[in-house]
Design a protein with these regions (language model features):
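Bacterial N-terminal signal peptides that target proteins for export
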Residues: 1-11
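Surface-exposed extracytoplasmic segments
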Residues: 22-232
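C-terminal motif of bacterial Sec signal peptides marking the signal peptidase cleavage site
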Residues: 17-20
Length: 232
């Protein structure tokens, strides 16, 4: 089985056929609580760029650790994120399910080893091509043996990048943006309590400026607005 980096397409489809439905209860009972993440870029969501929603579910109420972008080569080993996270959704045109895939990190000490779980509950790009919206149920992001109802807090980040270099000898720059002022505070992420329904918006925090793409000024990577919701 493929274990390093992103699975090759053939391996990915075989895995999904064998195990892609395992994350849903056999009874068909839906998990009531959902995480809804949406964000907008200054330009357009480009199919050849990579857009990530990273989720850290480790009961960290103080928000000590969370998912952050690597700021220099070798780019975290996976090409897009480092820090602490167990799940992520990627949008990229080469992926199945209209370019959306939910992944589970298999080893917290090796963030380049992923297991594809299939499509998010909902995922779409807005008609104007500027916004991306993803919905995942808590059953899909629960830790091994964890009741989804016991998820009380999450750390969340959004990362947009033009490429995901995995070669440790690749020292060339890449463009990226994440939540917060990426040029001044690249280690920003959200800590969201999930014990009740709530909506957190960029307007509530003022943490996301425009024009903060690192190593470039590409509007298609420039995150300018976001909203995160916990919904029952």
């Amino acid at each position: 089985m493929c274990t390093r980096g992103r699975f090759q397409t053939t391996c990915l489809f075989l895995f999904l056929l064998l195990a892609g439905c395992a994350r849903f209860p056999e009874t068909g009972q839906a998990v009531s609580k959902r995480l809804v993440v949406q964000f907008r870029v200054a330009g357009q969501i480009r199919p050849d760029y990579h857009y990530f929603i990273l989720i850290d579910n480790d009961n960290d109420f103080l928000g000590v650790n969370g998912p952050v972008p690597p700021i220099a080569p070798p780019w975290g080993g996976n090409g897009f994120a480092t820090g602490s996270f167990q799940y992520f959704v990627e949008h990229y045109s080469a992926l199945p399910f209209n370019g959306f895939m939910l992944y589970k990190v298999l080893d917290p000490d090796r963030l380049q080893v992923f297991q594809p779980l299939g499509a998010p509950l909902e995922a779409s790009v807005s008609p104007d091509g500027k916004s991306l919206r993803v919905v995942v149920d808590f059953g899909s992001i629960a830790r091994e043996g964890q009741d989804p109802a016991d998820i009380r807090v999450l750390q969340i980040n959004v990362i947009a990048t033009d490429r995901t270099p995995k070669d440790p000898t690749d020292t060339s720059l890449k463009m990226w943006d994440a939540l917060g002022d990426s040029r001044q505070s690249p280690n920003s992420y959200l800590t969201l309590q999930t014990d009740a329904d709530r909506i957190l918006r960029n307007a509530d925090t003022g943490m996301e400026p425009a024009g903060d793409v690192v190593n470039g000024n590409d509007p298609d990577l420039d995150i300018v607005d976001w909203q995160v919701e916990v919904r029952s």
